UniProtKB/Swiss-Prot annotation:
Gene giving rise to this polypeptide: PGSIP7
Name of the protein: Putative glucuronosyltransferase PGSIP7
Species for this entry: Arabidopsis thaliana (Mouse-ear cress)
Keywords: Glycosyltransferase, Manganese, Membrane, Metal-binding, Transferase, Transmembrane, Transmembrane helix
EC number(s) per entry: 2.4.1.-
Main location: membrane
Gene Ontology CC, one term: membrane
GO MF terms held by the record: glycosyltransferase activity; metal ion binding
Record lineage: Eukaryota, Viridiplantae, Streptophyta, Embryophyta, Tracheophyta
Record's subcellular location: Membrane
Top-level class of the enzyme under EC nomenclature: transferase
Cofactor: Mn(2+)
Length: 494
């Protein structure tokens, strides 16, 4: 019995150690560099932002990277996938990453040596709007995007957020004017993709506007640029000139096909954007549903498209050792709990103990907490940017494995404990079904399935609590002090 108690306790301790190890490993990824020369900003103001490697093209695709958010590593992975996907489309342009000085040096080397990007290091621009009442702190450093105007080595720059999914080559954008952007919102253009002509004059003027705190509704790059280019809505729609060597002058609105909001797809489950080429998908929604997170699919079907690009660009080799470690650990839990099934821990009490009712209530609470933890712990220790099929498989394996601990430790019936597991598996199948006519039918199907599952979850909860009470009443789990508990047929309670 002592050995079994030790085995069961060890399983939960190892689970907690995995969480600690995951947190430590992620922390190790974020060791910052030492602060570079404070005169760097002065040099940028005088000469513009220069890449350490000589420019190979006259135009560039650019994105930015900065530290200080809880999701730095995920955005680093997304940046690498964006770079590799552009490379795979054989774009006729350099790919530039505007990186803050505290981006880890190993990340910089990966971007330059493995991905072929040109990295420029910058000091973070001070955000004068961070004390606004509606300010979202995750956009604190998003004004670094303004550095794109200082990329004076290039004629045109297409500035990108990392949550863009490119479907085809978009080099025709370099023929656009001094500033071009897409109006996802009928009245407000989106800054996830825009075309600009680098200009130190414009860059200095933007910095001046930051100093005087130009009107900025959201305190981020979106609000600032919408305020700065307030007349863009009245400008003509961009049409690429037939001569691909001609660059237009002025400001233009870009067709919606260059920034297809993923939410449009979820309504019809297909693209139907007639104006302009369907070239780029953007994911401007909730941060926790960005396409690189394994749980984003099948909740949002397009997440699998992003992971398809990742699979053929940077792959998942960085996460796979940790995935395999977890899989082996979960299989070990199933084996250990199976071997420990015949005899389980028994607690003793005296009939006269005034705290008996409290002990029994606490015992039920602990049993339910173990079950709940079995479904929560695996979710948080799976590598967040792993492929969804691997992520969900590992989650289902982990939750089932950890569920066997309360099943065996508290002698619970199997079916009620794994009913949530079956419900989750069924939900995944309903959401992943490929033949829905549109997003409305899909949403109704998911809600209908959830509605049908709710009674089963409630019945399972009632069965678990009543089963625990019966076992307590029959003194299977709580034999009186001085008496031997039931040592045979523990599962035969009726």
């Amino acid at each position: 019995m002592d050995l079994q108690r030790t085995l069961m306790f060890s399983c939960w301790v190892l689970s907690l150690l995995i969480i600690k190890t995951t947190a430590y490993n992620e922390k190790q990824l974020f060791q910052p560099l030492e602060t570079e020369n404070a005169n760097a900003m002065t040099a940028v103001m005088e000469r513009g932002l220069k890449t350490q490697r000589r420019p190979e093209h006259k135009n560039a695709y650019a994105t930015m990277m900065y530290m200080g958010t809880p999701r730095d590593y995920e955005f680093y992975v997304a940046t690498r996938v964006l770079i590799r996907s552009l490379k795979s489309l054989h774009v006729d342009a350099d790919i530039v990453v505007i990186a803050s000085l505290d981006v880890p040096i190993n990340w910089i080397h990966a971007l330059e040596e493995e991905d072929g990007a040109k990295v420029v290091r910058v000091e973070n621009l001070e955000n004068p709007y961070k004390k606004q009442t509606n300010f979202d702190n995750r956009f604190k450093l998003s004004l670094n995007k303004l550095y794109a105007w200082s990329l004076s080595d290039y004629d045109r720059v297409v500035m990108l957020d990392v949550d863009n999914l490119f479907l085809k080559n978009t080099d025709e954008l370099f023929q656009c004017g001094q500033f071009c952007a897409v109006f996802i919102n009928p009245c407000i253009f989106h800054t996830g993709l825009f075309v600009l002509q680098p200009s130190m004059e414009v860059f200095r003027d933007m910095l001046h506007e930051l100093e005087v705190k130009r009107d900025n509704p959201d305190g981020a790059d979106q609000g600032f640029l919408v305020s700065y280019f307030s007349d863009l809505l009245n400008q003509p729609l961009f049409r690429p000139p037939p001569d691909n060597r001609t660059a237009l002058k002025g400001h233009f609105r870009l067709p919606l096909g260059y920034q297809m909001d993923a939410s449009y797809y979820y309504l019809k489950l297909r693209w139907n954007v007639p104006c302009g080429p369907n070239s780029v998908i953007t994911f401007p929604g909730a941060v926790w549903l960005k396409p690189w997170y394994w749980w984003s699919w099948p909740v949002l079907p397009l997440g699998l498209s992003w992971h398809h690009q990742r699979r053929y660009t940077i792959s998942y080799s960085a996460e796979m050792p940790w995935v395999l470690t977890q899989a082996v650990f979960y299989l070990g839990i199933i084996l250990v709990t199976r071997l420990a099934r015949p005899n389980m821990t028994k607690l003793c009490y005296r009939r006269s103990d005034k705290n008996l009712s409290m002990i029994q209530t606490a015992f039920k609470f602990v049993a339910l907490l173990f079950i709940l933890s079995a479904y929560i712990i695996p979710f948080f220790i799976i590598p967040q940017t792993i492929h969804p099929l691997i992520g969900w498989s590992l989650y289902l394996t982990g939750s089932f494995a950890l569920s066997t601990i309360p099943i065996n430790a508290f002698l619970l019936p199997i079916l009620p404990v794994i009913t949530p597991w079956l419900g989750i598996f069924g939900t995944l199948l309903v959401m992943a079904f490929p033949s829905y006519p549109d997003g409305v039918v899909r949403a109704l199907s998911v809600f209908g399935y959830a509605f049908c599952c709710a009674p089963f979850l409630w019945v399972s909860f009632v069965k678990i609590t009543s089963h625990l009470q019966i076992m307590i009443d029959k003194e299977v789990l709580f034999p009186r002090l001085g008496e031997s508990g039931v040592t045979s047929g523990l599962s035969k309670l009726y």
